[in-house]
A protein has these predicted regions:
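Alpha-helical hinge/cap motifs
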Residues: 2-3, 232
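Extracellular zinc-dependent metalloprotease catalytic-domain scaffold
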Residues: 3-160
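Broad hydrophobic/π-residue packing in well-ordered secondary structure
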Residues: 7, 138-142, 217, 417, ...
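Generic intrinsically disordered, low-complexity segments enriched for polar/acidic and small residues
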Residues: 14, 45, 53, 66, ...
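Short domain-boundary/entry signatures in modular proteins, especially
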Residues: 141-153, 401-415
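Surface-exposed loop/turn motifs in large extracellular/passenger domains
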Residues: 158, 162-208, 212-343, 350-383, ...
Length: 430
């Protein structure tokens, strides 16, 4: 007879669906192939399909080894129309097979804390995971932890419609700081989105992130006068944590002034299971120290941030760093417009000759760090020293920063860079 849903369905299994949209039912038989589904159909039987082939579909956001999905009211509220997992199903992918054992218990959102994957860079639940907990009966205010999440892809005009503040009785207390640890106002999980944050984000919680970006090819626009303040210790105003080809247009205020606060943190992070098990970064994928030839499958075959643009109206303040780039994260270009306010070190630990890079990628990826515009019109005031602008930062990127001073600039700090090209009046005041 094989396996089936015996006895009763608990609050979790009662929300399970297969890739054909069939809901789990008591006594329903579980099969492994579509051919078995069709055979059962001819006999008037509805069966539950759980494939065990583990075939990867390019562009999927899960490497789960099964094809089961969790659906519920709260989950639907969070993921909306997102198609997730191998099969592009509107539900949370669940790992079905544990070797030859039918498991159907582990959430398989990419890289998540609750997944059963060998590489994870979350220290807290995703909003979809919290929604799942609500659907199985837990009662709490999910919005204390997440303001918004984008699980859908190809949204070309996503606009925020509220900020992130303290909560009471299920409502935002506008203007009051949210004290929740690990809180995130906006999480972009998916790909090919253009998202504009135009409402304030106020957090005082430890290890919070105002905005977190994963996925690939996402563009984030922080609107003029928008405040993203994460004042708790070890917090980030903006965290770019996974993927490739992201673009940032920063016109607002990013501030992270607690202990070791980082305004813009660009970092894949460490594997919560240990880096010796599996390690990921830009153009880097290692298993047990050995390079893997599957970068595209895991959205690692590109620059993490294509362009980081701090525009003239922007303010970027961090107690540890205004901009921090980890040794596993490649940023192609940083443009800091004249008069942009920057307070806090600009740090890059990326090394184009990182030993974890495969040989074909070594000595190829440097970061252009541009202060001011490179246009001839903007440099017409070359001799007008009253146009000099000040940046309060040490610039620390000896291995990879190619720094261009395109406008009159007083750097109130030191510069340790790979290359310096001065096209205007440049002063070091550190």
């Amino acid at each position: 007879m094989g396996q089936c849903f015996n006895g009763f369905l608990n609050s979790f299994s009662d929300h399970l669906y297969d890739l054909n949209g069939v809901k789990a039912q008591i006594g329903m038989r579980i099969v492994k192939t579509q051919a078995e589904v069709e055979e059962a159909k001819l006999k008037g039987e509805t069966v539950f399909l759980v494939k065990d082939d583990g075939v990867y579909i390019n562009g999927s956001f899960s490497n789960a080894s099964g094809n089961v999905y969790f659906k519920g009211e709260n989950v639907a509220e969070v993921i909306k129309n997102a198609k997730l997992g191998y099969d592009g199903v509107n539900g949370i992918p669940i790992n079905a097979w544990e070797g030859i054992i039918l498991d159907m218990s582990h959430i398989e959102l990419d890289n998540s804390l609750m997944s059963h994957q060998s590489w994870r860079n979350y220290n807290f639940y995703m909003e979809a995971e919290l929604a799942l907990l609500q659907d199985i009966g837990y009662n709490f205010d999910r919005k204390l932890y997440y303001g918004d999440s984008i699980y859908e892809s190809n949204l070309l005009n996503w606009q925020s419609d509220h900020g992130y503040y303290a909560r009471k009785d299920g409502k935002w207390l506008i203007g009051e700081y949210n004290p929740t640890e690990y809180g995130v106002s906006l999480h972009i999980y998916s790909k090919n989105n253009i998202a504009t944050q135009s409402h304030d984000i106020l957090s005082s919680g430890v290890a919070a992130s105002g905005i977190r970006i994963d996925g690939s090819n996402n563009q984030l626009i922080i609107a003029n006068d928008t405040k993203v303040y994460t004042l708790g210790d070890y917090s980030n105003a903006l965290l770019i944590a996974y993927g490739k080809d992201h673009v940032i247009e920063h016109n607002g205020e990013l501030k992270a002034t607690g202990k070791e606060g980082i305004a813009i943190n660009i970092d894949f992070g460490d594997n919560t299971l240990g880096n010796a098990e599996e390690y990921r970064g830009s153009y880097i994928h290692q298993m047990s120290g050995n390079n893997q030839d599957d970068l595209a499958e895991y959205n690692l075959d590109g620059v993490l941030v294509k362009s980081l643009n701090l525009n003239a109206a922007s303010s970027t303040i961090g107690s540890l760093a205004s901009i921090y780039i980890a040794d596993n994260a490649y940023v192609n270009t940083i443009n800091i417009a004249q008069w942009a306010k920057v307070e806090g070190d600009i740090i890059s630990n990326w090394d184009p000759n990182n030993e974890k890079l495969a040989n074909q990628y070594k000595d190829s990826f440097y970061t252009d760090l541009n202060f001011g515009s490179d246009s001839s019109l903007s440099r017409a005031a070359f001799n007008a020293l009253d146009n000099t602008w000040s940046v309060k930062a040490n610039v620390l990127g000896y291995d990879n920063f190619k720094m261009n001073a395109n406008e009159n600039l007083n750097l109130q700090g030191s510069a340790f860079v790979y290359d310096l090209n001065n096209k205007a009046h440049f002063s070091l005041l550190g």
